[in-house]
């Protein structure tokens, strides 16, 4: 870009803004003499995961032991990096009590490695010792505190309520269970493969960590900035170009990032000031970035790291299948947000940027090799290679690409910094996965999932729409304030069973709860991504949240469409059906988006807006040719009326 505006946030301001709205970034800025210890442990942790990823060097290692190294080391780093309160971020050094907690947390988890044969053998016959239970208790408490520091309070509240339910929920009407004492619940949560060391932490230790490190490597090679430049070069000259570029950039960033708030701050620190300068309202600028960044969590191939866990939860599909299935819904979402920015720009007469302020597309195309790491991963996944192997090749491709430009060439210090940053980025995800395991464990041990499913089915009766509506509300409430991986784990274990019990295909049910858990980040009143964007835009947070909700309305409609018609998820459908469904869905989304933005081809007359909304809903109505046909005719009618009125006004203006 030829110009950097004075309102664009510096790196320090970005970090402060991110820490304000995202607990994951609120770590100590100056650990003092402990800095080298933190670096050594973090670098070692990343090297451990790279070593484990190579089948030739990794060798056999029981997954509980790998998970213990993964989680134990992460907990130690969290206590060394994250202060008790945010006010401790700027204090120099690490307090003695956090050092103590770091060693205690590491020791309690490493205890599993030392006593592995006992825990998996004789202890299950003769019973666990008092020491075993004490260590497990310490480990659980310290895990919860570490998660509070690195992730936030919402997931801790849910996990704590789960533990209390496991202990005291025996007499709750309808939701009662057989009951557990502290010893029984603790050993199940800490020493089995169904809770803390269950699927989420196993996936985190094998796949997620490597893909997060891949994202760090892309940042080091300048791919993130290339995404921004490519988006502005391709869309910046059109009507409302700055907002369209923000949407496109966030879609590209979302392919490799795992946090809507982090994406909002990283991209928004540049795009939001640009949108304001182009005369977009501050609330809209914040909303556009927040809705696009939130959409990044549903963008393949990473999908906020939830895709890996979904592939394990959904028995009928592989990870590469999940990636392919997620493409059409994600494109529909971003197309809808893109159209929303267009309608807003047309309504307020906001034009594109002059050519002098845009990067040269010729120059950008000469740097197309920067996309090689991403293309490498996607290609290998499509060809059927494992995610681990694909991630390794992607990391190698990123390292190779870094040498193409002098300012991105990675020396020893750059490599060490990348290894450390890989661990830092992974810490909140690891803590969230482990704590989500507590929630899953309680659901499994008490049968709570079946009870919730039964309750939702009773409320809905035989009405699928009502069941989806109640499930949507549950997912949004459960997803508020949770990171993407934990968000999906919680909603999948507590909400998806109801849809599956009703007969909804397993893939569609899991995508449904995943989508609604994600859009919680832009659903008032707890819309963290919108709040982060409003902080950059200096806008009213609630107005930004409401506007983001309007822009991202597709995210609230698409899940209903693919439950009623799984062809949108490429399930049991021929190519003709899929193409027709996508076309009608796009037209429907355009109509709904125009209604939300209060502008279509021209300003609405009082009757046109509700009719256009009706046409949009009819166009996305599932598997009914007559209703969809009627919606198309109504859409064409409104578009024709508006076009003729606009043409008449334009002619009169030209004559004058």
Please report, for each region that a protein language model flagged, where it lies by residue.
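Alpha-helical transmembrane segments
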Residues: 66-72, 202-212, 321-336, 386-395, ...
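Membrane-interfacial loop-to-helix junctions in multi-pass transporters
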Residues: 130-134, 194-207, 233-247, 278-284, ...
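Transmembrane alpha-helix interface/packing and boundary motifs in multi-pass membrane proteins
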Residues: 148, 215-219, 250-259, 291-297, ...
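Hydrophobic transmembrane alpha-helices that form the pore/transport pathway of multi-pass ion
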Residues: 228-296, 302, 306, 484-516, ...
């Amino acid at each position: 870009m030829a110009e950097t505006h004075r309102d664009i946030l510096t790196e320090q301001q970005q970090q402060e803004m991110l820490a304000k709205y995202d607990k994951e970034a609120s770590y100590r800025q100056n650990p003092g003499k402990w800095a080298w210890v933190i670096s050594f442990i973090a670098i070692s942790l990343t090297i451990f995961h790279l070593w484990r990823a190579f089948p030739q060097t990794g060798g056999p290692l029981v997954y509980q032991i790998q998970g213990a190294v993964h989680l134990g080391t992460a907990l130690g780093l969290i206590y060394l990096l994250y202060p008790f309160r945010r006010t401790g971020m700027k204090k120099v050094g690490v307090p003695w009590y956090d050092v103590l907690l770091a060693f205690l947390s590491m020791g309690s988890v490493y205890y599993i490695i030392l006593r592995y044969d006992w825990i998996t053998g004789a202890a299950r016959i003769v019973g666990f010792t008092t020491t075993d239970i004490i260590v497990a208790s310490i480990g659980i408490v310290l895990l919860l505190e570490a998660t509070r520091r690195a992730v936030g309070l919402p997931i801790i509240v849910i996990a704590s309520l789960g533990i209390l339910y496991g202990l005291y929920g025996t007499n709750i009407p309808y939701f009662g269970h057989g009951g557990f004492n502290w010893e029984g619940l603790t050993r199940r949560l800490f020493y089995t493969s169904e809770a803390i060391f269950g699927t989420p932490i196993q996936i985190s230790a094998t796949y997620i960590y490597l893909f997060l490190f891949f994202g760090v490597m892309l940042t080091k090679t300048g791919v993130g900035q290339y995404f921004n430049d490519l988006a502005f070069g391709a869309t910046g000259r059109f009507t409302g170009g700055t907002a369209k570029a923000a949407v496109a950039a966030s879609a590209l960033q979302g392919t490799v990032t795992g946090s809507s708030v982090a994406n909002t701050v990283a991209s928004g620190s540049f795009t939001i000031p640009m949108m304001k300068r182009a005369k977009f309202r501050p609330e809209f600028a914040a909303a556009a970035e927040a809705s696009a960044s939130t959409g990044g969590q549903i963008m393949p191939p990473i999908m906020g790291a939830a895709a890996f866990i979904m592939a394990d939860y959904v028995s009928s599909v592989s990870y590469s299948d999940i990636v392919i299935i997620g493409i059409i819904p994600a494109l529909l979402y971003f197309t809808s947000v893109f159209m929303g920015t267009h309608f807003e720009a047309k309504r307020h007469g906001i034009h594109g940027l002059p050519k002098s302020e845009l990067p040269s597309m010729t120059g950008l195309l000469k740097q197309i090799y920067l996309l090689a790491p991403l293309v490498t991963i996607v290609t290998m996944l499509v060809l059927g290679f494992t995610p681990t192997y694909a991630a390794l090749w992607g990391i190698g491709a990123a390292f190779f690409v870094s040498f193409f430009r002098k300012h991105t060439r990675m020396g020893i210090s750059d490599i060490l910094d990348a290894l450390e940053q890989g661990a830092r980025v992974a810490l909140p995800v690891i803590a969230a996965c482990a704590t989500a395991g507590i929630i899953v464990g309680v659901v499994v041990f008490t049968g709570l999932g079946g009870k919730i499913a039964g309750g939702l089915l009773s409320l809905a009766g035989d009405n699928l729409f009502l069941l989806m509506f109640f499930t949507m509300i549950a997912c949004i409430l459960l997803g508020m304030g949770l990171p993407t991986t934990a968000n999906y784990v919680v909603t999948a274990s507590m909400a998806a069973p109801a849809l599956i019990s009703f007969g909804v295909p397993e893939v569609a049910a899991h995508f449904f709860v995943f989508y609604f858990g994600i859009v919680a980040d832009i659903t008032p009143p707890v819309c963290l991504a919108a709040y982060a964007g409003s902080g950059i835009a200096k806008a009213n947070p609630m107005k930004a949240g409401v506007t983001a909700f309007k822009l991202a309305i597709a995210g609230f409609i698409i899940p209903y469409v693919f439950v009623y018609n799984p062809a949108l998820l490429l399930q049991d459908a021929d190519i003709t059906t899929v193409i027709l469904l996508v076309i009608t869905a796009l037209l429907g989304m355009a109509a709904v988006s125009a209604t939300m933005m209060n502008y279509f081809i021209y300003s609405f007359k009082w009757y046109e807006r509700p009719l256009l909304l009706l046409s949009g809903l009819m166009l996305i109505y599932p598997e009914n040719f007559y209703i969809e046909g009627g919606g198309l005719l109504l859409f064409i009618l409104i578009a024709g009326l508006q076009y003729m009125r606009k043409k008449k006004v334009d002619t009169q203006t030209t004559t004058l």
